C-alpha cells in the first residue's frame, strides 16, 4: 500500500448538487494535470515511468499526470473555470495557505484514482525531487468522494476482468498495478493510503458476484521481505470465508511486481501469479521457517507456534487437513497428536486469545523461555516472533480486518 499523508477535509451536510460539482472539479483538474505531463517541466515525471519499463500506451491507459511548480497553478486554473475555492477544498484539490488558496500537490507525478463509474475522485502523488520535504507518497485527503478505506487504484481498468475471471490480484503500489497490467494480468488493484481492509474486500466480492459464499480467488502479492510477512499475517487475520479462497504470490529476491517485470520480463510476472500458494499454507510455512526443524527442539518450538495458527482456521475439514500437513512439515511422527492439539487449541474460549495478542504487542526481544507446555502460547520474548508480533500490532490497529 501507499503511505498516507494528509488530513481530513471531508465535506458534511452537502448542498444538493455538491457531489456533481466535486466530480466536475476533479475531472477538470485531472485534464489539467494530464496536459502538464507533456510539458518540458514534467520530463522527470515522464522519465520516472519510462525508466520503469512503461510504454506510452500504458501511461496513457492509466491517465497519469503531473502537478506543476508554483503554489497555486492548478487552483487558479480551476477558479478561472468558475469553481469556488470552497468546492476545490472540499474536493481535496486545494487548501488554504498562509497567503491564500494553494494547490495540494506540487511537482509530483500523479495517478488518478477513480470510482467504479470511472469518475476521478482523487489522486495519488509521488515525490520526484530531493528538495521536496513531504512524504514519498501522498494521497488526496478524505472527502465526500474519496474514502481511502473503500477506494482501490486500478479498479476502473480491472473491474470487468475481475468480474469475468472471478479473480483479483492485490498489490502494494501504483507502479505494481501498472506492471501487472502491462504484463497481461488485468485484474490487479492496490489500496490507496491505507492497508487493504474489510471494505476493500466487500468491493471485490460484489464485483465477483458473490452474495452468499466467496467462490473467487483473491491473490495477494507480497514482497519477500519482513514487510511482506506482516502484510500476509494481517490478511490471514481477516474474514475466514474469504481467506480460505485467498492465495499468496511472493516475488523472488524481495522484488515487487514492478521490479520483477523490469528485471525479468512480462512472463515472470505472469508466472508469479500462476505459482500462487494458498494463504493458509504460506502463513504456516512462514512460521515454521523461523525454526530449525532439523533439531528436536526446533520441531517442538515450531509446533508450539504453528498449532495456534492452524486452530484459527474456522473451516473444520480444512483445519484437519492443515493439522496433518503441519505434522509432515515439521517432521512430527504422529499426525493424530497434532490434530488433537489443534482441536484443543480451537476449543479455547476466544476471550483467552486477546491477552496473547496484547502480550505480543508489549513484548521485548529476549531469549526464548524453554519451560513451556506443549500448546501454551509462545513466549513474547522469543526474538524470532518479531514479524508476527508486528503483524498483530497492525491487526489491533485495524480491527475491521480482524476476524
Where are these predicted regions, by residue range?
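Short, well-structured beta-strand/strand-turn elements
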Residues: 52-65, 184-195, 335
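Short hinge/gating elements
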Residues: 8-16, 31-33, 136-144, 288-293, ...
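Short coil/turn segments at secondary-structure boundaries
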Residues: 6-11, 40-51, 59-64, 86-93, ...
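Non-catalytic interaction/clamp surfaces of large macromolecular machines
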Residues: 14-19, 26-60
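Phosphate-handling DNA/RNA-contact segment within nucleic-acid enzymes
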Residues: 11-28, 47, 69-214, 232, ...
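Conserved P-loop/Walker A NTP-binding site and adjacent catalytic elements of P-loop NTPases
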Residues: 1
Amino acid at each position: 500500500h501507499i503511505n498516507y499523508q494528509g488530513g481530513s477535509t471531508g465535506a458534511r451536510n452537502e448542498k444538493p448538487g455538491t457531489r456533481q460539482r466535486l466530480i466536475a472539479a476533479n475531472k477538470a483538474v485531472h485534464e489539467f494535470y494530464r496536459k502538464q505531463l507533456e510539458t518540458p517541466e514534467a520530463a522527470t515525471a515522464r522519465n520516472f515511468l519510462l525508466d520503469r519499463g512503461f510504454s506510452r500506451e500504458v501511461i496513457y491507459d492509466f491517465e497519469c499526470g503531473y502537478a506543476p511548480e508554483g503554489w497555486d497553478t492548478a487552483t487558479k486554473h480551476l477558479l478561472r473555470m468558475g469553481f469556488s475555492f470552497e468546492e476545490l477544498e472540499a474536493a481535496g484539490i486545494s487548501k488554504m495557505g498562509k497567503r491564500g488558496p494553494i494547490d495540494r500537490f506540487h511537482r509530483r507525478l500523479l495517478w488518478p484514482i477513480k470510482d467504479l463509474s470511472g469518475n476521478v475522485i482523487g489522486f495519488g502523488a509521488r515525490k520526484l525531487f530531493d528538495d521536496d520535504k513531504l512524504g514519498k507518497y501522498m494521497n488526496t485527503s478524505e472527502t465526500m468522494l474519496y474514502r481511502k478505506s473503500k477506494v482501490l487504484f486500478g479498479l476502473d481498468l480491472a473491474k470487468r476482468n475481475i468480474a469475468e475471471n472471478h479473480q483479483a490480484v492485490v498489490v502494494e503500489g501504483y507502479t505494481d498495478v501498472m506492471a501487472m497490467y502491462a504484463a497481461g494480468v488485468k485484474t490487479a488493484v492496490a489500496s490507496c493510503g491505507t492497508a487493504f481492509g474489510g471494505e476493500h474486500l466487500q468491493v471485490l466480492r460484489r464485483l465477483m458476484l458473490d452474495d452468499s459464499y466467496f467462490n473467487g480467488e483473491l491473490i495477494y502479492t507480497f514482497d519477500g521481505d519482513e514487510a511482506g510477512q506482516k502484510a500476509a499475517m494481517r490478511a490471514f487475520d481477516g474474514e475466514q470465508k474469504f481467506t480460505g479462497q485467498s492465495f499468496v504470490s511472493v516475488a523472488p529476491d524481495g522484488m515487487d511486481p514492478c521490479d520483477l517485470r523490469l528485471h525479468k520480463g512480462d512472463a515472470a510476472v505472469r508466472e508469479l501469479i500462476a505459482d500462487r500458494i494458498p494463504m493458509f499454507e504460506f502463513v504456516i510455512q512462514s512460521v515454521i521457517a523461523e525454526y530449525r526443524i532439523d533439531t528436536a527442539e526446533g520441531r517442538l518450538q515450531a509446533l508450539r507456534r504453528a498449532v495456534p495458527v492452524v486452530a484459527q482456521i474456522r473451516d473444520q475439514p480444512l483445519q484437519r487437513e492443515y493439522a496433518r500437513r503441519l505434522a509432515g512439515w515439521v517432521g512430527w511422527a504422529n499426525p493424530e497428536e497434532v490434530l488433537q492439539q489443534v482441536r484443543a487449541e480451537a476449543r479455547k474460549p476466544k476471550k483467552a486469545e486477546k491477552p496473547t495478542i496484547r502480550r505480543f504487542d508489549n513484548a521485548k526481544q529476549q531469549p526464548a523461555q524453554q519451560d513451556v507446555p506443549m500448546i501454551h502460547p509462545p513466549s513474547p520474548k522469543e526474538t524470532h516472533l518479531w514479524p508476527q508480533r508486528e503483524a498483530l500490532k497492525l491487526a489491533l490497529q485495524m480491527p475491521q480486518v480482524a476476524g
